[in-house]
């Protein structure tokens, strides 16, 4: 019985110590931007602040699992993106939770003197929430922030959910502001000392919606929009063109392409628990020997 107790004690100590020292907890700070109908190709265009929290579990010196909770604002404006006559604008806070796998190109672990740097790739799956909104423009065609935010999803600016008719055989469905996302990217990580690790990374997010910016398909008859929502802002926010009202059925966006967003920035993580962790199994063996000697003194 004493031998069994001793074995369980050794196993529990080594397991808890190893698990703790393989774990890292930290923060993310950087920026977020979006690619879609209002910004088709401008990488890092109109970047806004982003931040969050990171948990990493190092499976080996090459592989790790990671959980992220990130938040940031994405925005785009036709006046900046090259189509000022359409005159659309949006902003949205993006909140993301994801699980990712990391693969280090080189042997790496926090606290190592010889393996303190590695490029890495990451990819995974997650969910995110968004809720696009805009401002009206004043007589100088500037966004009037004093007038307050106008949230766009509830306005159904492309007739989402409206009943079919002869002119419009099929309207898009009402879009969900909680969606799946596929994050992937690359980065570099540096071991600062026995406890802290610094990372620099850039990740793209493939979404499964074309309404992150509330723009996807075609202009709709204003009367249908008003009847569909009962909100007079619906036709006003749907067609803000500088060159006059657009003919219903005219292209407003590109529904064949999904929207993307991106987080880029730095991470600072700290290894949970003290000791050398994966880097030094000899130290763990010495600790086990200490427990063994203490056990024999108790006999």
Model-derived segments and their meaning:
Residues 45-49, 93-97, 117, 178-182, ...:
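Residues that define the transmembrane beta-barrel architecture of outer-membrane proteins
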Residues 34-40, 75-80, 110, 130-135, ...:
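Outer-membrane beta-barrel proteins
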Residues 27-31, 53-57, 99-105, 123-127, ...:
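Residues on the lipid-exposed face of transmembrane beta-strands in outer-membrane beta-barrel proteins
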Residues 20-58, 132, 261-265, 269-273, ...:
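Short glycine/proline- and aromatic-enriched beta-strand/turn motifs that initiate or cap beta-hairpins
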Residues 35-41, 83-94, 108, 169-174, ...:
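Extracellular loop and loop/strand-boundary signature of outer-membrane beta-barrel proteins
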Residues 23, 62-65, 109, 195-198, ...:
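Repeated loop/turn-to-beta-strand initiation elements of outer-membrane beta-barrel proteins
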Residues 63-157:
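Gram-negative (and chloroplast) outer-membrane scaffold detector with strong preference
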Residues 193-299:
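Predominantly the C-terminal beta-signal and adjacent terminal strand-loop region
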